[in-house]
Swiss-Prot record:
This is Probable L,D-transpeptidase YnhG. The gene is ynhG. Residues 303-323 have a biased composition (Polar residues). It comes from Escherichia coli (strain K12). The keyword Glycosyltransferase applies. Residues 303-334 are annotated as: Disordered.
């Protein structure tokens, strides 16, 4: 079943190049907590051309909105009420530098000396050209990068009837955008960079690099230093026991290795400690099973006696001036 590839093509065909984006800052939770933010609801308006326009408004990935709403169309009808998945569990990793979770199409940045985490949507490698899991660092900051297509990229482009030049100069048409962070992994072939195709952010379409919206990479580029640690993980299932005793799981669709795989039904590799978490008497195992089946992409309470809905979801019936409603757990800044 070629669900993933067909959905990607549908999204790319439907999305227009919209430049507006927002940086989302979450205040760090107390020690021992990983739950941040609040889910929001939004009613699609007449002027909303497509799902990507809505995703950019909330600086999230269109794929995450599709996960959260399950049956929504890539071009939702006006009047449709959708969930914006802006509540999340922080990755189970040290809160420093850059953390990329491929499975959730998100990049986390912990600015040194600040009690916040910045969360950005990203685009990653497609099947056969996957972005690798790695622990590395920012090896080089490159403003106004040029792009030298590899032999493989040039061949794949020729197969689509596109002849690429040996070198693409810096500028608005450069596929790397205006800013690039070269990772020290391997031979330095992997970058975190902008893009001349903003439709691709939030999808699996790159040759292995990590793509960001233009305003997002500009903000990240200005903040990070050479040597900043970078950890790339692939964890579709996250879980947390909060200080107040509440239990949560956040489940994303796993990354498929082949187009024929159905990401809604393919099995998971569960994180360490998950079996013990599920078997605890304070956890409702039926709610865990429902969360693993549903794969909604946002935290769900699985505490015994809880309901399978995410907590604290304020209504954003019609965001004014294109801005989402702001709660005390979420700050949105340009």
């Amino acid at each position: 079943m070629k669900r993933a590839s067909l959905l990607t093509l549908t999204l790319i065909g439907a999305f227009s190049a919209i430049q507006a984006a927002w940086a989302v800052d979450y205040p760090l939770p107390p020690t021992g907590s990983r739950l941040v933010g609040q889910n929001q609801t939004y009613t699609v308006q007449e002027g909303d051309k497509n799902l990507q326009a809505i995703a950019r408004r909330f600086d999230t990935a269109a794929m995450l909105i599709l996960e959260a709403n399950n049956t929504i169309a890539p071009v939702p009808k006006p009047g449709t009420t959708i969930t914006i998945p802006s509540q999340l569990l922080l990755p189970d990793a040290p809160r420093q530098g850059i953390i990329v979770n491929l499975a959730e199409l998100r990049l986390y940045y912990y600015p040194p000396g600040e009690n916040i985490v910045q969360v950005y949507p990203i685009g990653i490698g497609l099947q056969g050209l996957e972005t690798p899991v790695m622990e590395t660092r920012v090896g080089q900051k490159i403003p106004n990068p040029t792009w030298t297509p590899t032999a493989g990229i040039r061949q794949r482009s020729l197969e689509r009837g596109i002849k690429l030049p040996p070198v693409v100069p810096a500028g608005p048409n450069n596929p790397l955008g205006r800013y690039a962070l070269r990772l020290a992994h391997g031979n330095g072939e992997y970058l975190i960079h902008g893009t001349s195709a903003p439709d691709s952010v939030g999808l699996r379409v790159s040759s292995g690099c990590i793509r960001m919206n233009a305003p997002d990479i500009k903000a990240l580029f200005s903040s990070v230093r050479t040597g900043t640690p970078v950890k790339v993980i692939n964890e579709p299932v996250k879980y947390s026991v909060e200080p107040n005793g509440m239990r949560y799981v956040e489940v994303h669709r796993p990354l498929s290795a082949e187009e024929q795989q159905n990401v809604q039904t393919m099995p998971y590799t569960l994180p360490a400690g998950f079996t013990q978490f599920k078997d605890n008497k304070a956890v409702d195992q039926k709610l865990v099973d429902k969360a693993l089946y549903r794969r909604a992409g946002y935290p769900v309470s699985v505490s015994s006696g809880a309901t399978p809905a995410a907590s604290n979801a304020p209504s954003v019936e019609s965001a004014q001036n294109g801005e989402p409603e702001q709660g005390n757990m979420l700050r949105v800044t340009q």
